[in-house]
Amino acid sequence: MSEWDYKIFWDEAVNQFKEELAFSIFSMWFLPSKYEKSTENTVYLSVPSKFFRDQMIHNYKNGIEKKLFELSGKKISIDFIIKPNTSEDLSKAENEGGNDKKEDAAKPSSAESKKKSVKTEGGRGQHPDLRPEYNFEDFVVGPNNNFGVNAAIAVSTNPGSAYNPFLIYGGVGLGKTHLMQAIGNKIWDTTKLKVIYVTAENFTNEFVECVQKKMMPAFKSKYRKADVLLIDDIHFFQGKVETQEELFHTFNELYEKNKQIVFTCDRPPAELKNLSQRLKSRFERGLNVDLQTPAYEIRYAILLKKMEKHSTKIPNEFIDMVAKNVSSNVRDLEAALTKLIAYTELTKKTMDEATAKNLLRDIFGSTRQRNVTIDLIQRTVADYFSISISDIKSKKRTKSFSFPRQIAMFLCREMTECSTTELGNDFGGRDHTTILHGCNKIEEQIAADPSLEKIIHELRNTIKENTNK
């Protein structure tokens, strides 16, 4: 089979995936994956990063190989070449890929090696306002943030075209700033685009100072000439009428020029108070994604990832202790891990369980929420959908009952430490595979339906409020 034949089969596979997949998924993963070359029975695709490659291998490699077999009648393997996009590539429309021009290169995962290797596209060096350790490779992905991470990668791969504006919201310490700056770092490292990162507070302070010093032309020029504008913590703009007015006009000018705009917020835009409706509508115009509290397994993985950066290693039993007792956010997980590492390094003593619990008692005490029970979640979901708890636990399969039941399963798995077997017992004697199926079903629907994401967010808030009563 000639290389041309392999290319034809790949192009046809892409066309079929375009018909079969949601456009958001197709544009996120298949448009940036480009045919590079082929050898006997292997097709090589270029992808923009190591993280992107790993996700393609995990989620799509088997499906692609199956599709190629169906088309060609031969077993064809897929392999990946990492080629960070050039600015020329990024300027092309979503329906056209173009060829990459850089040599194969994988991004280093550590902040130190990243600092040494970011001289790309003209040797600009590290962005002065972005932290190098905030990159996609160091971001632990799980069901609580998978949709947001995938969308962020799409934005960084095709700024101004994929999702614009792009807004990331969620509670304190869940990775909003990390994800935003990862977008900025990726674009800065791989293109010549002008990237501006600013907190909403600093934007406001700078605006006030420029008004007082009659320097507004310079202020407008700075922000309206950005190719990528990243504004962190936009909830700070609440009640800042004049700043909102300036941001509104800055937004419009950048949006009309197809410049990428990214925001973070501690809540959905609809819940912001004292914010002009027209600005709120701008925030909601593009894609809004919610970063949720990580489940136990993801908290454990985050701690292991953080520990990679330290020479001192903490025994897994204490990592498990932290993951089980700190469920609030990533920042608190880091604080607990840092305390254990500091004790080990400074005292040179072997840590035992009693010592670890004593060291972390303040963190455990301040972050542990009052118990969220299965019963509370079931009651909250039942009330929301105007059904009874017995309906939630019943074997009824009509959608009016099965859908709320699966949402309750999803929230129980996220907000409690109960095993799937325990959850099955409290959901009418179901086995653990039924619980997993229900949770997975909701995760898939959240990724495809933003309105469901809002329902989950509202239920989660109601449950948390009820635990504090």
From Swiss-Prot:
GO terms for molecular function: ATP binding; ATP hydrolysis activity; DNA replication origin binding; lipid binding. Residues 129-344 are annotated as: Domain III, AAA+ region. InterPro entries: AAA+_ATPase, Chromosome_initiator_DnaA, Chromosome_initiator_DnaA-like, Chromosome_initiator_DnaA_CS, DnaA_C, DnaA_dom, DnaA_N_dom, DnaA_N_sf. Residues 1-83 are annotated as: Domain I, interacts with DnaA modulators. Keywords: ATP-binding, Cytoplasm, DNA replication, DNA-binding, Lipid-binding, Nucleotide-binding. Pfam families: Bac_DnaA, Bac_DnaA_C, DnaA_N. Gene3D superfamilies: 1.10.1750.10, 1.10.8.60, 3.30.300.180, P-loop containing nucleotide triphosphate hydrolases. Its main location: cytoplasm. ATP binds at residues 173, 175-177. One of its GO terms (cellular component) is cytoplasm. It is found in: Cytoplasm. It comes from the Bacteria. Residues 345-469 are annotated as: Domain IV, binds dsDNA. Transmembrane segments: none annotated. Residues 83-128 are annotated as: Domain II. Domain I is involved in oligomerization and binding regulators, domain II is flexibile and of varying length in different bacteria, domain III forms the AAA+ region, while domain IV binds dsDNA. Plays an essential role in the initiation and regulation of chromosomal replication. ATP-DnaA binds to the origin of replication (oriC) to initiate formation of the DNA replication initiation complex once per cell cycle. Binds the DnaA box (a 9 base pair repeat at the origin) and separates the double-stranded (ds)DNA. Forms a right-handed helical filament on oriC DNA; dsDNA binds to the exterior of the filament while single-stranded (ss)DNA is stabiized in the filament's interior. Oligomerizes as a right-handed, spiral filament on DNA at oriC. NCBIfam families: DnaA (TIGR00362). Belongs to the DnaA family. This is Chromosomal replication initiator protein DnaA. It comes from Treponema denticola (strain ATCC 35405 / DSM 14222 / CIP 103919 / JCM 8153 / KCTC 15104).
